[in-house]
């Protein structure tokens, strides 16, 4: 996350940290005791290690809950997958992961509400994650960083992205003058509007946070029926 501050230690109980065996990370969001949602491009053929209740990933407190992925589902629901072919398309950059055992709800491990209505253009929303804070260099913080950005009309991203795939199932968000953005390592994390999971960090330009460059987020409300069918 660029241009933000360390998240409040108790202010992200739904935020999951996803680890691949080779070390790269994504974020995810706890939906209920058994499932998290993340970006499809975070797909990994092997087991993903999932930390919940994590704040400082280098200094664990002992009340974190660690699970591994038992099953991964990409959109559409028929893609309960063995290979990553159905998960690699950014057009529907959303993936559900079933945990190997249920989490216990605590002060630091709780789900985030799904959206009840679309976020309005101009709304201020919060994006968070453990991604790099120093583009074009890559420096990953020990703690999640939060920043507030603005919901923009998708046409803004279409102009900035010049024929990139801006569909009705994505959202455009950022700041006109740059300086605040999600970035490398934040993929799969939440864009939160009015206390609800409005978007999932999907993609954007690099270096991040450039003026007239914006982040693209999976529009969660477009996949609500699918998510609720698990």
From Swiss-Prot:
Glycans are attached at residue 84. Its EC number is 3.4.21.-. GO terms for biological process: proteolysis. Transmembrane segments: none annotated. Its main location: secreted. Residues 1-230 form the Peptidase S1 domain. Expressed by the mandibular venom gland. SUPFAM superfamilies: Trypsin-like serine proteases. Extensively glycosylated, contains approximately 8 mol of monosaccharide per mol of toxin. Pfam families: Trypsin (PF00089). Keywords: Disulfide bond, Glycoprotein, Hydrolase, Protease, Secreted, Serine protease, Toxin. GO terms for cellular component: extracellular space. Disulfide bonds join 7-146, 26-42, 125-193, 157-172, 183-208. It comes from the Eukaryota. It is an enzyme of class 3 (hydrolase). It is found in: Secreted. The active site is at 41 (charge relay system), 93 (charge relay system), 187 (charge relay system). CDD domains: Tryp_SPc (cd00190). One of its GO terms (molecular function) is serine-type endopeptidase activity. Has kallikrein-like activity, releases bradykinin from kininogen. Catalyzes the hydrolysis of various arginine ester substrates for trypsin and thrombin and degrades both angiotensin I and II by cleavage of the dipeptide Asp-Arg from the NH2-terminal end. Fibrinogen is also degraded but a fibrin clot is not produced. May have a potentiating effect on potent hemorrhagic toxins present in the venom. Belongs to the peptidase S1 family. This is Gilatoxin. The lineage of its organism: Eukaryota, Metazoa, Chordata, Craniata, Vertebrata.
């Amino acid at each position: 996350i660029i241009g933000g501050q360390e998240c409040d230690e108790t202010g992200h109980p739904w935020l999951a940290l996803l680890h691949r065996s080779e070390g790269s990370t994504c974020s995810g969001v706890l939906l209920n005791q058994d499932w998290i949602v993340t970006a499809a491009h975070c797909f990994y053929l092997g087991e993903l290690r999932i930390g919940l209740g994590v704040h400082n990933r280098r200094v664990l407190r002992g009340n974190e809950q660690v699970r591994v992925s038992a099953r991964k589902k990409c959109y559409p629901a028929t893609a309960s997958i063995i290979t990553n072919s159905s998960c690699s398309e950014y057009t529907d950059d959303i993936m559900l992961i079933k945990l190997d055992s249920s989490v216990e709800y605590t002060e630091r491990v709780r789900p985030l509400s799904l959206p009840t209505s679309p976020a309005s253009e101009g709304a201020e929303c919060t994006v968070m994650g453990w991604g790099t804070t120093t583009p074009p260099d890559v420096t990953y913080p020990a703690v999640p960083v939060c920043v507030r950005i603005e919901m923009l009309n998708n046409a803004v991203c279409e102009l900035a992205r010049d024929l990139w795939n801006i569909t009705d199932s994505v959202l455009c968000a950022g700041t006109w003058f740059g300086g605040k953005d999600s970035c490398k390592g934040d993929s799969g994390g939440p864009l939160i509007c009015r206390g609800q999971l409005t978007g999932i960090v999907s993609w954007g330009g690099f270096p991040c946070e450039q003026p007239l460059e914006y982040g693209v987020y999976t529009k969660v409300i477009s996949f609500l029926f699918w998510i609720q069918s698990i």
